[in-house]
């Protein structure tokens, strides 16, 4: 969990308050992290709660984390009363824990969550790729968020466990993209496979041309990734024409994007915006 909280302990679903709902809960189940977001009735993300994605965890674990998140959001009161929630939506790329998370949500809130789907996405955006069903839900949501909030054509960079690039053409169609190892994934591979390379934190090196192993690794991962992104953008833009919007999101974007030469907008809530647009 990401903040210290002591929510009231309850063993089953919580009593709900009277009146209209206080907003929506959106869960993004990613390969490394589960992010729980609270959106108000107007669609504004008010707060988020993070926990690690661990496939072997139990329903009880997810119940505890959900209660802690709701308490942190101000939806679970000290007396154990839960404010009414309009709906709960899940976007997941980790099917192994979907059933556990679903049961935890039902146990705590009494609400059966809706899973963001390809059908939801296709109501908002035209997907012009082979086998749309194989496209990750995170990339679908990113594309919808970019199209609805920034317009077309657009390039979307999502920097998580993998670094993905999505492309929306001038007609507003999603036409494909690229998938590469993520920043932390690359670093982990280096330290795992090369016995003399240490595990490091992602920080800007003191010198661009590294003067020791630490600086060399930091420079390689930060400036190397930034240069890769710039290079991919340079190759994509000629296929899209003018006035291309470039948007970055994901947990690792803030480490790298400021070192890119292109003008790139960082929108940390892009995926949630897309999910809300597709499931409203």
Question: What are the residue ranges of the model-derived segments?
Answer:
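Short glycine-aspartate micro-motif
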Residues: 24-28, 89, 154-158, 247
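Intrinsic disorder/low-complexity segments
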Residues: 1-23
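Short glycine-rich, Thr/Ser-proximal phosphate-binding strand/loop in the N-terminal lobe
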Residues: 2, 23-68, 173-198
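Phosphate-binding/catalytic loop of phosphoryl-transfer enzymes
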Residues: 111-115, 124-193, 223-232
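Glycine-rich phosphate-binding/hydrolytic loop that grips phosphoryl groups
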Residues: 195, 264-280
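Glycine-rich phosphate-binding loops at beta-strand->alpha-helix junctions
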Residues: 33, 91-98, 242-260
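Phosphate/pyrophosphate-binding loops at sites that engage ATP/ADP/AMP, CoA/4′-phosphopantetheine
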Residues: 66-87, 232-244
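Adenine-nucleotide phosphate-binding core of ATP-dependent small-molecule kinases
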Residues: 55, 205-245, 252, 263
């Amino acid at each position: 969990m990401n903040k210290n909280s002591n929510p009231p302990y309850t063993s089953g679903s919580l009593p709900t308050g009277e009146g209209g709902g206080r907003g929506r809960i959106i869960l993004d189940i990613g390969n490394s992290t589960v992010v729980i977001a609270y959106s108000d009735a107007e669609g504004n993300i008010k707060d988020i709660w993070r926990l690690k994605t661990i496939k072997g965890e139990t329903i009880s674990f997810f119940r505890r984390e959900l209660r802690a998140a709701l308490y942190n959001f101000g939806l679970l009161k000290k007396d154990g009363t839960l404010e009414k929630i309009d709906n709960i939506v899940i976007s997941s790329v980790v099917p192994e824990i979907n059933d556990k998370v679903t049961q935890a949500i039902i146990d705590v809130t009494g609400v059966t969550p809706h899973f963001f789907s390809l059908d939801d996405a296709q109501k908002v955006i035209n997907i012009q790729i082979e086998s749309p069903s194989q496209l990750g839900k995170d990339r679908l949501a990113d594309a919808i968020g970019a199209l609805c909030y920034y317009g077309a054509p657009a390039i979307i960079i999502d920097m998580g466990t993998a670094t993905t690039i999505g492309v929306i053409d001038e007609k507003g169609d999603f036409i494909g993209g690229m998938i590469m190892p993520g920043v932390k994934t690359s670093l982990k591979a280096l330290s795992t496979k090369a016995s003399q390379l240490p595990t490091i934190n992602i920080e800007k090196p003191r010198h661009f041309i590294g003067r020791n192993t630490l600086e060399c690794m930091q420079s390689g991962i930060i400036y190397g990734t930034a240069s890769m992104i710039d290079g991919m953008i340079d190759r994509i833009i000629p296929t899209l024409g003018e006035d291309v919007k470039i948007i970055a999101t994901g947990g690792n974007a803030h480490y790298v994007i400021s070192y890119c030469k292109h003008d790139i907008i960082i929108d940390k809530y892009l995926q949630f915006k897309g999910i809300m647009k597709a499931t409203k």
